[in-house]
Amino acid sequence: ERLHWLCAAGGPATLPDPIALVAFPQGCQYRNRAIHALESAGRRWRIAYESPNLSGLQAAVEGGLGVALLEQRCQTPAMARCDALLPRPAPSELALCMSDTGSRAVHELARLIMDFCGDDKLRQAA
């Protein structure tokens, strides 16, 4: 699923400099992608709020503490997309590696993952 920049509903028409970022702790790929997108676009940023829990991030965004880069399904009614105000992050990539000697269950799981990732809805979201 494509990631979106989310802010509080009725949020600002422009964003502050530096960008107030709401993010998961260091090591999270969403955080890394948000920072990379901002830095690649020459935008300054600061961590305004950090939480290991999605509900904590959602509450911070809803409360207007900053913006977060999250999946669309994480958007609550109290949030709005602000993609037009911020740089688009690089698309997601997924690599699936398995051994030919894997069990039947491993091969079935791999097939399910490939079918899911090959879904037209996912291609359109990216």
Language model: regions and residue ranges:
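Hydrophobic/proline-rich hinge and linker segments of small-molecule sensing/allosteric domains
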Residues: 1-26, 93-101
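Secondary-structure junction motif
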Residues: 20-41, 106
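Short, structured loop/turn "capping" segments at alpha-beta junctions
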Residues: 13-15, 43-46
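Short beta-strand-to-loop elements that line the ligand-binding cleft
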Residues: 24, 44-53
